[in-house]
Every structure is written in structure tokens, then in C-alpha cells.
Amino acid sequence: NLSSWEYLKGGKKEQRTARNGYEYTYSEGPVAFPDALDKPSRTILTGEGGRGASRTKHVVEQNGRLRRLVPDELDQLQMFPRGWTDTGMTDGHRAFCMGNALVTGIPHRIGVVIAADADVSRSE
């Protein structure tokens, strides 16, 4: 339900009580809701799958409606080809895999530049 998503994604400052009776102020800033399509994506976490609302799951607006990202989109955000995790496992397991994956394309590109600079330095 939309109100659950809005609460979880919204900023909050609430008085809470720990099990031992200690009272404290819990606060967290807002998370973009829905996620902006014109900005870099937030990190995909292992909890991306499943049905329930969550502060960390990605939600986008398309044609005036809110929707979650599908596994192929999660694959692509992690720089894997579309369908990379489509091995017959459930969508929830596919989302978990992408939340547990490392984005290797960017570090690889950085490494190529570093290696090229090292080669130039050695030849000087």
C-alpha cells in the first residue's frame, strides 16, 4: 500500500524505546520516492526482491504509475547483460543475486586506465 512506501521512504525523527527501556530519538533522512530516472541508481541490496514495502527497494514511475524494477533491469543496473540471472530461479532469488553482486564494469575500466598509465611511465 502506498502509505507504507511513503512512510518507509520518508524522513523521520521519532521517539523510540529499546527493549531494555532506554528511550532514544531515531532519525533518518528521506530516500527519493519514486527513484529518479535521470540520476545514478542507488545501490541494489539483497533485500530488493520480495513483496513488501521497503526503504531500500527501487520504485520508478512509468506512465503515471509506480512500479518496482524487474530482474532484467536489476541485471542491467549491475552492468550484466539483460537476462544474466534468468536461469530458472524465482524473481526474488534473481533480485537477491543482483543485490549480492559487484559492479565489475566500472572498476575494470578504472584498472585499464591505471594499467595504461603504468605502461607509459615504464616506457619513459
Region roles according to the model:
Residues 1-124:
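C-terminal target-recognition/interaction regions appended to catalytic cores
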